[in-house]
């Protein structure tokens, strides 16, 4: 059994906790939704939810859709909310033994572009490897005509300090992949192990639980993931951590 000291909490993947983040998560997964639905899946007050929605609208991430109002009897109609068309894109890079996957995603997590680059990292210096994939990333982002928001990188093996990768199948021993990317892209860059990234992706598919009734405890959720391929690993994800 793995000793407790060997179990790490991911510094990269955190579930939504702020009112705006919780609202955004629910809208992203269940759109169109009303403010009432958001209140039902939050522990925050109705005024707090209203302020969170206003902040998301002001940030051009969410919009009201009066044309989708469904009559539900007397009273003020509830205006549905949905996400706006993605205002920027996110890049995902999955490093493999013989090929690297590149994906361009919108704010809802939808795939916009994808490409495999056939390259064996173990046969190249880090600088040469990055020089090979950067033109593909630039071309894919340019084709969307949208600004780049951030870059996420997953790799086999072990990732330390969100920066250094040690993976025998890649031929890397404590290689720094963040600094070369940071020289070329002025956006946040995150790095995680592949099993950590898979758990983080699963975490982002979980809708916040319904508001508890009275003293009833908040419903919990846990998922256990095993990964066996060029590397092996395991991770547990909850709604708030990996």
Named regions from a protein language model:
Residues 53-54:
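Short, hydrophobic-biased segments on the C-terminal half of alpha helices
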Residues 1-41:
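Extreme N-terminal segment that seeds HTH/winged-HTH DNA-binding domains in transcriptional regulators
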Residues 30, 68-70, 217:
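A short, glycine- and basic residue-enriched loop/turn
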Residues 111, 118-214, 221:
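Glycine-rich phosphate-binding loop and adjoining helix at the ATP-binding site
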Residues 75-113, 222-242:
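Gly/Thr-rich phosphate-binding beta-strand-loop-beta motif of the actin/hexokinase/Hsp70
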Residues 57-74:
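Beta-hairpin "wing" of winged helix-turn-helix
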